[in-house]
Amino acid sequence: MELSDCSNEYEKLVVRMNMPRVVIDNGVCPNSTVVKIDSARSPGILLESVQLLTDMNLWIKKAYISSDGKWNMDVFHVSDLNGDKLTDENLIRYIEKSIETSHYCKTEGYTGLTALELTGTDRVGLLSEVFAVLADLECDVVEAKAWTHNGRIASMIYVKDGNSGTPIDGDSDRVQRVEGQLRNLLKADDGYQNDTRTCVSYGGNTHMERRLHQRMFMDRDYEKKFDIEKSPIVSVQNLPKRGYSVVNLQCKDRMKLLFDVVCTLTDMAYIVFHAAIRTVGETAFLEFYVRHSDGHPVSSEPERQRLIQCLQAAIERRTVKGVRLELCTADRPGLLAEVTRILRENGLNIARAEISTKDSIARNVFYVTDANGNLIDPEIIKSIREKIGIDDLSVKEPFPISCREAVEKEQHIEPQDHQGRYGGGTVLVSLGSLVMRNLYHLGLIKSYF
C-alpha cells in the first residue's frame, strides 16, 4: 500500500472516531424528547448542534452542556412546535443522521443563486423600495430574511435572473446597477457613524440567521442604550480560582433563543465549557461558563460591558414586534414588491421579514407595526387583507401558545407563580448548583469543579 493510501485511510479513521454519537430518548420526560450528543471537542461544534436542532423547528426547553478535556457531552430537551415530544421515527432517524454527519458533510447551500447582503438605517417603507428595485431589475427573490434593531436594518436576499433563472453575478454591469441602486436606498442618516454596506456574492453555504447576527454585530447595533425595564437581564462574573467567566441570562422564552446566544458567544470568540438552560413558564434562565479563545476569562470592565450589550442585542433582534402576517400564494414576478408596497402605503413598518419560494409557491412572513413601532388598528389589517386577498394573507400568533403551556404542565407551575421574576431587575437566579449537579450525575466533571 502506498503512503498516500495509508494517509487517506488514517484520515478516514480519525473522522469516524471523532464523529458525534447521538442518542435520542423518549422515555425520560413526559413532554419532551432528550437528545444526547457525545462528540470530540472542536471550535464551533456546540453552535452547529444547536443550529441543526433549531433549523428543524425544535423548541429547546432545557439543556446541559459540558466539556471534559477533548470531549463534549450536550443534552437537549426538545419538543415540536406544539409542545409535544417527537414521535415520528423517520424524523428521529433523520435528526440522528444529520447530527452525526453535520460536522463533516457540509451542505451545498444556495447554489445557482446570487446573495445580496444589506445593512443600513431603517425607515418605514425601506424594504418595499428594495424589493421594487429588484423587481425593476428583473431579479426574482427566492429567499430572504430581514431584521431591524435599534434603528438599523440587516438583510440577506438570495436572487436569480427573472428570465433565465441563473445567477446575476456573471454580469458585472448588472451587479453594479443593483449595488448602486440599493446603496442609494440604504444611505445612512447624516451624522450616523456607520456606513451603508452592500455585498454581492455567488451562492455559498452561509447560515442566513447567523450571518444576520454578524451583520448587526459589525454594524454595532448593540451600542444604543437599552430600556432597563424591558431588556433581557444579563450578568457576567469571574471565578478566578476556576478560570471561568460566568454569564447569566434571564429573559422571556422563545424559539431559537439558545441559538442566538450561542451564536453571539461564538462570534465574539468565547468558548462554552459548561452550561445549563431551563425554562419556568414563559421565562428562560441560561448560565454559561466561558473563556475567551485566548484561554482567559473576561479581563476588563469594558469587555464585560460589551459582552453584556452584545448578548442583550442578540436576544432583542429576534424579539417579536407587532402583528405577524403570513402570505401564502402562487408566486409571480413582482409579487413581493406589490405586497410590501400595499403595506407601505398603509403606513405599516416591516420590523422583520422571512421570504421563501418553493415549487412556485410564495410563503412570506411579515412582522408589522405602525410608523412609531406600536400595534396596528385592526381595521387597517382588515383593509390590507382585502387588498391582497383574504385567503392569501392571514394574521397569526407570533409563536404557538401550546409550547409554553406544555412547559408549565411538565414543571407543574402555574403561570401566575412566575409573573414577578423580573421584579427589581437586578437579581438573577443562579444555575450554578444546577449545572454542577447535573454534570456530576452525567459523569462529565473531573477537574473543572
From Swiss-Prot:
Tissue distribution: Expressed in roots, leaves and stems.
Superkingdom per UniProt: Eukaryota
Keyword Repeat recorded: yes
Key word Repeat present: yes
UniProt-listed Pfam families: ACT
GO-annotated biological processes: cellular response to hypoxia
SUPFAM superfamilies listed in its UniProt record: ACT-like
Cellular component GO terms held in the UniProt record: cytosol
Expression induction: By cold stress.
InterPro entries assigned: ACR1-12, ACT-like_dom_sf, ACT_dom
Gene3D superfamilies, per database record: 3.30.70.260
GO molecular function: amino acid binding
Function: May bind amino acids.
Protein name: ACT domain-containing protein ACR7
Protein source organism: Arabidopsis thaliana
